[in-house]
Amino acid sequence: SLEGVMVGISPWHLIDQDQINLFADATLDHQWIHTDHRKATDEGPYNSTIAHGYLTLSLIPYLWKQIAEVRNVNMEINYGIENLKFGLPVKVNSKVSLQATIKSVNNLRGTVKVIIEAKLLIEGESKPAYTGDVIFLYHFK
């Protein structure tokens, strides 16, 4: 059984202002806390801009692929996230890493449902950016 197995921790991924700005453009979310360095530094609570929470969530599939290789997959579906809790904000120029532990694996008539306990680590911080149970559906060839 794979339940409870810590699959691994991804390599560190730098979140810079360019990535934050591109995400702001893609999602039409240009709040100053994300995009205005001067205002965020002078008036914001974090002394810098911060990444959008949804930007950090959208990195899960990329970071997961750095940890686990699932072979013979025809299609992988990001099915959802349960019990999501945001912790610390991710400041610009921070490095993040995904820690993944298998919570469950179920075969649903040919589709495999995998739930991982995901924790987004921030380099130099003791608390994560978030934790949650990420659900992937795999359709195999």
Model-derived features: positions:
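Hot-dog-fold acyl-thioester-processing enzymes
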Residues: S1-N78
